[in-house]
């Protein structure tokens, strides 16, 4: 240090220096040290110096000539086989745990996806059903509307005495347009005048042909039709009441006949002791014959009734009542025949036992 300080020149005696130059770094050598041929080559093709200690090639770029020694890799001791086994086993355990977790996660995801799919399918089915119901309802409404639009209707004003009825005539099944029969039935419902006693007049003409279309008669919406006829005939009402009473009596006798038929079924099935069957069959036969006589009396009363031709309702009711009583008489004959068969079977059995 003393020598250096003594060798220094005084500040004023120093020679003027030029611009300060930066000294080159000790670890690198200037770019001019590399040859132009090497500079132009890619790094992979440049010349390298193999380190004597490490045995690896090191690039000579940036290394000063004979300045520093190249770095030497430390020798690493080889791992023991036991540590390698422990490491491999721990890795396998970790991998198995990860796989198990991933499987669990995958299973949970699959369940969630399944639930979502089921919920989606249920919602789709519900929406489809609602859409189907809505479509069906819409179609039904459209069909009803189209039927109403397609069905020809006719509004008619019917006058009866001092009363007025606004009627809407529609055709019955099988008819494409309303006919006189449809109008007459509607008038009967509205006024109470029976159809046989109606006289419908339109433009001075009586409507007698029941199958004639109203359009063929020149009827249009708002046309007027006059009704002539009484709501009820007192004389016919008396005859209808008689027929009604006879019908009620016939139904009561028919109910009694059903009870006799049940008694016969009990005897046939053996619900009664054999010693009492013969006597029970005789009593049952007498009851059936009495029932037949009651039905015959009703027929006689019906035959004695005299009904004029204009009493069409009474005559029709009498005809139906006669048919009903004849059906009851046929049932009586069937029961009586069964009683005779059962009596003969019982007698043959008793004879066989006596022999």
Swiss-Prot record:
Q: What's any one GO cellular component for it?
A: cytoplasm
Q: Would you tell me the protein name for this molecule?
A: BAG family molecular chaperone regulator 1
Q: Which GO terms describe its biological process?
A: apoptotic process; negative regulation of apoptotic process; negative regulation of motor neuron apoptotic process; neuron differentiation; positive regulation of neuron apoptotic process; positive regulation of smooth muscle cell apoptotic process; positive regulation of transcription by RNA polymerase II; protein localization to mitochondrion
Comp. bias intervals (Polar residues): 80-91, 102-111
InterPro entries, per the entry? BAG_chaperone_regulator (IPR039773), BAG_dom_sf (IPR036533), BAG_domain (IPR003103), Ubiquitin-like_dom (IPR000626), Ubiquitin-like_domsf (IPR029071)
What Gene3D superfamilies does the record tag this protein with? Answer: BAG domain (1.20.58.120), Phosphatidylinositol 3-kinase Catalytic Subunit, Chain A, domain 1 (3.10.20.90)
Look up and give the organism this protein is from: Mus musculus
Q: How is it modified after translation?
A: Ubiquitinated; mediated by SIAH1 or SIAH2 and leading to its subsequent proteasomal degradation.
Positions of the BAG domain: 256-336
Q: Enumerate the UniProt keywords alphabetically.
A: Apoptosis, Chaperone, Cytoplasm, Nucleus, Repeat, Ubl conjugation
């Amino acid at each position: 240090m003393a020598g250096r300080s003594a060798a220094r020149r005084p500040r004023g005696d120093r020679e003027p220096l030029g611009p300060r130059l930066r000294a080159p770094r000790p670890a690198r050598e200037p770019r001019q040290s590399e040859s132009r041929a090497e500079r132009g080559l890619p790094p992979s093709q440049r010349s390298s110096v193999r380190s004597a200690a490490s045995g690896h090639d090191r690039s000579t770029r940036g290394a000063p000539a004979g300045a520093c020694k190249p770095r030497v890799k430390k020798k690493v001791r080889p791992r023991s086989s036991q540590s390698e086994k422990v490491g491999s086993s721990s890795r396998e355990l970790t991998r198995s745990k990860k796989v198990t977790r991933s499987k669990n996660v995958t299973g949970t995801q699959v369940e969630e996806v399944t639930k979502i799919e089921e919920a989606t399918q249920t919602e789709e089915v519900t929406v489809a059903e609602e859409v189907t119901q809505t479509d069906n309802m819409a179609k039904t409404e459209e069909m009803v509307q189209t039927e109403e639009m397609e069905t020809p209707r006719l509004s008619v004003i019917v006058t009866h005495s001092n009363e007025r009825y606004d009627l809407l005539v529609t055709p019955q099944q099988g008819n494409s347009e309303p006919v006189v029969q449809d109008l007459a039935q509607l008038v009967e419902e509205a006024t109470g005048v029976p159809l046989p006693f109606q006289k419908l007049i339109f433009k001075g003409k009586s409507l007698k042909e029941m199958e004639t279309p109203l359009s063929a008669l020149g009827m249009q919406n708002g046309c007027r039709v006059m009704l002539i006829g009484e709501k009820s005939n007192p004389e016919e009402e008396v005859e209808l009441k008689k027929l009604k009473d006879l019908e009620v009596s016939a139904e009561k006798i028919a109910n009694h006949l059903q009870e006799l038929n049940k008694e016969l079924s009990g005897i046939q099935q053996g619900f009664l002791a054999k010693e009492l069957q013969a006597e029970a069959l005789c009593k049952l036969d007498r009851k059936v014959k009495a029932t037949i006589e009651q039905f015959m009396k009703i027929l006689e009363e019906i035959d004695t009734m005299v009904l004029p031709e204009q009493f069409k309702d009474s005559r029709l009711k009498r005809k139906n009542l006669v048919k009903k009583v004849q059906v009851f008489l046929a049932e009586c004959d069937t029961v009586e025949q069964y009683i005779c068969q059962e009596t003969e079977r019982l007698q043959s059995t008793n004879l066989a036992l006596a022999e």
